[in-house]
A protein has these predicted regions:
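A non-catalytic, amphipathic alpha-helix used as a structural packing/dimerization or gating element
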Residues: 139-147
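Beta-strand/loop substructures that line and gate deep hydrophobic ligand-binding cavities in soluble
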Residues: 85-139
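Hydrophobic ligand-binding cavity/cleft-lining segments
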Residues: 1-49
Length: 155
């Protein structure tokens, strides 16, 4: 199963790439539907560091636990296009039943705007759980699109 976005953001590509490495942006584009919190003693880092796993937890609407997972960023290029991939995995709760791959690619449109390709591919155990969760995932991804469009000019 997957959810994805292909949206144009009103921000330069370097600003978008920088914002995607910010835990505060991850939090801002998913709440109130999914509220993330750091499990690290010192809270969220200022930036995600490639190769360094950061423990997090999430709750639907801030009250219904979704479980623990971790963010583990990789940066690479595909045919000259920068890609950010989260290799993190679930530890408990719903996240513990999920195998996922989250990739975001940014393309400079040459006019000060950026094309963002954002795709989450996931598999749940049992598979029917993935089907049941898909409508909610789709709603969260549409919310992400709205919030990213709203926030991008401030990046």
């Amino acid at each position: 199963m997957h959810v994805g976005l292909r949206i144009v953001l009103d921000a330069p590509v370097d600003a978008v790439r920088d914002a995607l490495l910010s835990p505060s942006v991850m939090v801002a584009v998913t709440k109130p539907f999914l509220v993330y919190r750091s499990r690290a003693a010192g809270g969220f880092p200022e930036r995600w560091t490639p190769g360094r796993a950061e423990p997090i937890t999430a709750a639907a609407f801030g009250v219904v636990p979704s479980g623990d997972t971790h963010v583990d960023i990789d940066l690479y290029e595909v045919q000259g296009v920068p890609v950010q991939r989260d290799n993190g995995g679930g530890v408990s709760g719903l996240f513990g039943r999920m195998d996922m791959s989250h990739r975001m690619a940014t393309v400079d449109l040459g006019d000060g705007r950026t094309l963002l390709l954002d795709r989450l591919t996931y598999r749940m155990r049992p598979a029917l759980l993935g089907l049941a969760l898909w409508p909610g995932m789709w709603v969260i991804w549409q919310w992400r699109a709205l919030r990213m469009r709203q926030l991008a000019p401030t990046w």
